[in-house]
Amino acid sequence: MAGGGLQTAMTARTLESHPIHLGKGATAVPQPEFPRDERAIQWYRDYGARHADDGEEGRLVSCYGFAEDWPGWEMHPAGAEVVVCLEGSMTLIQKIGGEEVRTTLKPGEYAINPPGTWHTADVPEAATGLFITAGAGTQHRPR
């Protein structure tokens, strides 16, 4: 294998159940199964600990389905976040200069949350999104 890395067998997984960590050295590391319940907060804490050495260069690639508006706001101070709509539609809401800026995404469209930008989303019906997130230091607050 080029670069002297270890070669491992490929395993098919779904991004919704097993997110991927993109790290330093162009690594891509499948993550443990993501729980869809109260254990999710601990999963994120454990993820941060597992990949702390990547710091602000680490990215989480994840996929989530939504049936309703997001209940809170979030902000990623370490870097930009890419949001891609895969199915349905979602309106991404960003707080920029004290104003709410709304961008509606349809399948195949994306938007970027700049570092430090508080954001949430309205989901009029069901939607699925792909997220590439610089998660170090992520903050949350109620909507």
Language model feature labels by segment:
Residues 77-92, 132:
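Short, conserved beta-strand element in jelly-roll/cupin
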Residues 61, 125-142:
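A short hydrophobic beta-strand segment most commonly corresponding to one strand
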Residues 117-120:
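Short, charged beta-turn/beta-strand-edge "cap" motif at the junction between a beta-strand
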Residues 56, 67-82, 98-99:
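A short beta-loop-beta micro-motif enriched in histidine and acidic residues
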Residues 1-72:
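A short, N-terminal "cap"/entry segment at the start of jelly-roll beta-barrel domains
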Residues 71, 88-94, 109-110:
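Short beta-strand segments in beta-sandwich/barrel cores
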Residues 97-115:
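Short acidic-glycine-tyrosine-enriched beta hairpin
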Residues 76, 104, 123-125:
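Short glycine/proline-enriched turns and hinge-like loops at secondary-structure junctions
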